[in-house]
Amino acid sequence: MEIGSAGPIGAQPLFIVPRRPGYGTMGKPIKLLANCFQVEIPKIDVYLYEVDIKPDKCPRRVNREVVDSMVQHFKVTIFGDRRPVYDGKRSLYTANPLPVATTGVDLDVTLPGEGGKDRPFKVSVKFVSRVSWHLLHEALAGGTLPEPLELDKPVSTNPVHAVDVVLRHLPSMKYTPVGRSFFSAPEGYDHPLGGGREVWFGFHQSVRPAMWKMMLNIDVSATAFYKAQPVIQFMCEVLDIHNIDEQPRPLTDSHRVKFTKEIKGLKVEVTHCGTMRRKYRVCNVTRRPASHQTFPLQLENGQTVERTVAQYFREKYTLQLKYPHLPCLQVGQEQKHTYLPLEVCNIVAGQRCIKKLTDNQTSTMIKATARSAPDRQEEISRLVRSANYETDPFVQEFQFKVRDEMAHVTGRVLPAPMLQYGGRNRTVATPSHGVWDMRGKQFHTGVEIKMWAIACFATQRQCREEILKGFTDQLRKISKDAGMPIQGQPCFCKYAQGADSVEPMFRHLKNTYSGLQLIIVILPGKTPVYAEVKRVGDTLLGMATQCVQVKNVIKTSPQTLSNLCLKINVKLGGINNILVPHQRPSVFQQPVIFLGADVTHPPAGDGKKPSIAAVVGSMDAHPSRYCATVRVQRPRQEIIQDLASMVRELLIQFYKSTRFKPTRIIFYRDGVSEGQFRQVLYYELLAIREACISLEKDYQPGITYIVVQKRHHTRLFCADRTERVGRSGNIPAGTTVDTDITHPYEFDFYLCSHAGIQGTSRPSHYHVLWDDNFFTADELQLLTYQLCHTYVRCTRSVSIPAPAYYAHLVAFRARYHLVDKEHDSAEGSHVSGQSNGRDPQALAKAVQIHQDTLRTMYFA
């Protein structure tokens, strides 16, 4: 298999993704149910038309209303009793051809507008091609799909897209679509999140090609929406004001900034014009209150006068403002100076919250949405019954049948690897249900800590000296048991305050105590000190730091202290445990490097922050030690721009550490969605090859490129209740599926490698996009599962392989390195993310790790 000629990125060559090399056989069989429902599709052709609506750039909801109105209006002349389905953009499908000329037809459609005015639209409908579901049947039987599901093409001849549109047409008219999910306003339940937001429940629905058949993936889903309420109340929620009437003064600057950040970009409707509820988008909040905010008003005689907003509302609407001391919303285009007093505006219903939730909101959300596996299974079954596909007129029009029972699948529970510890007795731990115990065991290679310091950023009142003493004694006891002895008392133990004292203190420590190995930093809750400690320690001075929350110092538990030791040992160059060598797959017989890669994007609404790409690589044969590389790149760019130089660095580092050149590169890539598979693979595979060739022109190690996906909606349930594990009744750790619900012929599998503690476990989905090493299904599944046991932060198997997890941690840590002390306060009170005033060079320098830290696992 060879990639076509290396053309420009735009023109992608034909790319042969490897076919499945066979099925896995290892492990104990387990009967499962998957939330996939078989869709029977007739072997017919359907007709695709391109729809062009002018004015364009309307939201899909409006487009749907236009097309719906068009079908009703031109029923007699064009549509007859056909029921077309429409994707909200440019594709319209019919089961029978329409009587329109090959040149297409232009139609006029009007929708009732706001305030009694009609909105005119021009719609052109033009035949594009027939779409064959015969071909789809052949592909599902193991042929090849006509083309990958390119979801970004404007008019898609892809038969899978046609199936998807048929099944989404009715719900798109009935509910509020968000991505591939549908939501409706809460009725009979109320889940406020605070800050003017609330939880809406709904369902996810997507069509997936599976073996021999099409499957409909259905899952329960929840997301945050803004509560429809008066803007005054919204402001009170955002600013924690309990009673607006007790706020007789104008907003403070910091309050106004916080309120602006939340309401900017939202739609509001006005209440002072009777039934004419005009809607506007908020672009800003005025600095001045309504009583002082002026604008130029043109009088009937043509002269222009300055009026305050409060005056204008009194004169024009005989409305005496109740809160003239509050600011106004500036709406529409900034240059137009349209101001509305807060008290005449409501937040428009049905607006999804794309801004990042606060920590409290996130935890409320999880509590409201976490369901044990059996509950979720029941809820999904209920959803499918209530969706009632057999009565959906559009599903009937295209002769579909949707089964209403979940797909039965046979999975396998893979054996867990044994883990080798150190100490005199070199004990072995065998995980049970994804968990093992370190009690009575010592690290494989423990570090001796001779020189260490404590910096306490909690106040002396919060954390008295005897509490600190008790904590250090406990920590030393646990660390000695774990085989990582901390010798004697700290060489330095002082209280400090505020982020500004971090750098001078650390510089003093570095200059005074040569051979200082570790600084333990005690933090008083969520604080900007953390970001500063990591910036100074990781990037500026190259010092190992371990932060601990003060609550865990006051109330120590062996579990917390033991977890602390897991992190400290690794940061200082130790090895906690290794996979017992003789049970590892044969890929370990020659030098192999495991790479993990991830790109994290700034939260929505933060246009100015860069995306961060991280790649980590294993540095030994176990594999247990990793080295990290990190770069900033253009916001929202998924391809790792600088991958060639990052991989090159890691290969050099591997050679320095092991004196071997890897003969194989196993690359786990997180965070790529299916629509991007081909372009990301094309660019990144060539980049990895380029890195190899830049070291030696004949150096061509075999590359295996695997995408790891966690953000999908496939869930697996035990068919037999007795197999359920734990309080939430999940599938056992190690459950693997590579038949029935997987791709008809590509090499993919689901593996749930962790024990679900809360809610329903989400199996990770692995898709092999390139494989020079010709892995069998068993080898790759087992290797992947074993790597999930090598994550150093806990004694549990985690949900994705350690290298992919570490890449995520590295990128996440780099976000902290980018926090700009001058602008970013930890609460994020500043509008949008900073790091905007800094040029790309400054950003690149900010995430650069100090030479002394570079070779350590500082991110652990």
Swiss-Prot record:
UniProt-annotated binding residues for a divalent metal cation: 598, 638, 670, 808
The biological process GO terms on file are: miRNA-mediated gene silencing by inhibition of translation; mRNA catabolic process; positive regulation of gene expression; positive regulation of non-canonical NF-kappaB signal transduction; pre-miRNA processing; regulation of stem cell proliferation; RISC complex assembly
**Keyword Lipoprotein in record:** no
Q: Name one GO cellular component term.
A: RISC complex
| Swiss-Prot/TrEMBL keywords | Acetylation, Cytoplasm, Endonuclease, Hydrolase, Metal-binding, Nuclease, Phosphoprotein, Ribonucleoprotein, RNA-binding, RNA-mediated gene silencing, Translation regulation, Ubl conjugation
Enzyme nomenclature, EC number: 3.1.26.n2
Q: Where is the Piwi domain?
A: 518-819
Positions carrying N-acetylmethionine = 1
Q: Where does this one sit in the cell?
A: Cytoplasm, P-body
Question: Where is the stretch described as Interaction with guide RNA?
Answer: 530-567, 758-805
Give the enzyme's main class according to its UniProt record, as a single word: hydrolase
State one molecular function term (GO): metal ion binding
Catalytic activity annotation: Endonucleolytic cleavage to 5'-phosphomonoester
Query: What Pfam families does this protein map onto?
Result: ArgoL1, ArgoL2, ArgoMid, ArgoN, PAZ, Piwi
Q: Where is the PAZ domain?
A: 230-349
Describe the task this protein carries out: Required for RNA-mediated gene silencing (RNAi). Binds to short RNAs such as microRNAs (miRNAs) and represses the translation of mRNAs which are complementary to them. Proposed to be involved in stabilization of small RNA derivates (siRNA) derived from processed RNA polymerase III-transcribed Alu repeats containing a DR2 retinoic acid response element (RARE) in stem cells and in the subsequent siRNA-dependent degradation of a subset of RNA polymerase II-transcribed coding mRNAs by recruiting a mRNA decapping complex involving EDC4.
Q: Which family does it belong to?
A: Belongs to the argonaute family. Ago subfamily.
Matches recorded under PANTHER family? EUKARYOTIC TRANSLATION INITIATION FACTOR 2C
Quaternary data? Interacts with EIF4B, IMP8, PRMT5 and TNRC6B. Interacts with APOBEC3F, APOBEC3G and APOBEC3H. Interacts with EDC4.
Q: What is this protein called?
A: Protein argonaute-3
Species of provenance: Mus musculus
